[in-house]
Regions:
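Active-site beta-loop-alpha junctions enriched in small/polar residues
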Residues: 8-12, 42, 73-75, 103-107, ...
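An alpha-helical appendage that flanks or caps ligand/catalytic pockets
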Residues: 1, 115, 119-160, 192-279, ...
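Acidic (Asp/Glu)-rich catalytic clusters
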Residues: 30-31, 56-65, 87-97, 182-183, ...
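Short, acidic/polar
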Residues: 17-29, 86, 170-180, 261-271
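N-terminal beta1-alpha1-beta2 module of alpha/beta enzyme domains
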Residues: 1-62, 164-166, 285-288, 313-319
Length: 320
């Protein structure tokens, strides 16, 4: 299976005063052969961030090669009919390059309150929304009467270019999230996990899919991986630690990120590959003004190691 590496600017690299930064971000991806560009989702908050669906329409226009996706979209806060229309439009105009990844949203109840949605029901809302969106993409006339959403004899156009429908990736590192992927998802995009946790979660995904008579592609296991490249490993760890958005109390952040020299980062990515992951979304653990340089280094020194399947990635990483 081939490995694909995409990138997300992260909470500290989504621009600011210069709207042209998004064009520059796309140019980095095209210049260095990244597979895809992803944007995170925050509806309210003081931290500067773009609305991802709107911003990704610009990405689709700036590049005719890059795939693009949400990493990840807080699905319970969206109307699934409107979102299905938005994603179908993006996918149609980009000729099948849209990769929707969704999740339950943040633990902070502020966004749920602001959007008029109960946090208590977010898991059930997500499951129902995924089923409804997929029907709207695949069927001409849809009637749905569920616990949270209702529509009668509706259709959306255009239909997505990606047939039968864009794959819906689901985030979350819990057992419940892995089981949700198996029940209703098409892929797992997980963050803040160790390679061993990827291996165990992957087993849960495929076991749950089998229980529900579903098939998930072997290469639809992905990792959102924080990283920082530096020849000085100790300084890299000290710097990157300040930019870990949601540190885990039970695991040091270095166990579920890639921080240090090029060889170390390549080895860490290979550990995830060995655990069954083939898709990666890398995020620089650094200030926004340094993010572009880090993405360029990753694109120059790491991406070619994994996007060229004919040569061992470890052999190439160890070359002087």
């Amino acid at each position: 299976m081939s490995v694909a590496i995409g990138y997300v600017p992260g909470a500290f690299g989504q621009g600011g005063r210069d709207p042209n930064f998004l064009r520059q971000l796309v140019q980095v991806g095209d210049t260095y052969g990244y597979d895809s560009l992803w944007l995170s989702d925050r509806i309210v908050g003081r931290q500067w961030s773009l609305e991802p669906i709107v911003a990704l329409s610009m990405v689709a226009a700036y590049s005719d090669r890059l795939k693009f996706g949400t990493s990840v979209l807080a699905l319970p806060l969206r109307n699934p009919v409107v979102l299905a229309k938005q994603i179908a439009t993006l996918d149609y105009l980009s000729r099948g390059r849209c990769l929707p990844a969704v999740g339950l949203g943040q633990e902070d109840p502020t966004e749920y309150e602001a959007c008029g949605v109960s946090k208590v029901d977010r898991g059930q809302r997500t499951d129902e929304a995924i089923v409804l969106m997929r029907r709207l993409w695949q069927e001409d006339r849809v009637t749905h009467e569920g616990a949270f959403f209702t529509c009668h004899d509706v259709s959306i156009t255009p239909k997505p270019c990606f047939q039968p429908s864009p794959p819906i990736w689901i985030g979350g590192r819990t057992i419940a999230a892995a089981k949700r992927v198996g029940r209703v998802g098409d892929g797992w995009l997980v963050s803040s996990v160790t390679p061993d946790e990827v291996r165990r979660g992957r087993d849960i995904v495929f076991a749950t899919a089998a229980q529900h008579q579903r098939v998930i592609e072997d290469d639809h296991i992905g990792v959102l991986l924080g990283y920082y490249i530096s020849p000085d490993g100790q300084k890299a760890v000290a710097k990157a630690a300040s930019f870990v958005t949601r540190p885990r109390p039970d695991v040091p952040f270095t166990a579920c990120s890639a921080v240090g020299t090029t060889a170390h980062i390549a080895e860490r990515i290979q550990q995830y590959v060995d655990a069954g992951a083939t898709k990666f979304v890398v995020r620089p653990l650094c200030p926004g003004e340094e993010a572009m340089a880090q993405l360029a280094m990753m694109g120059q020194e790491i991406v070619p190691l994994f996007h060229t399947p004919t040569v061992s990635t470890m052999d190439k990483a160890r070359r002087p």
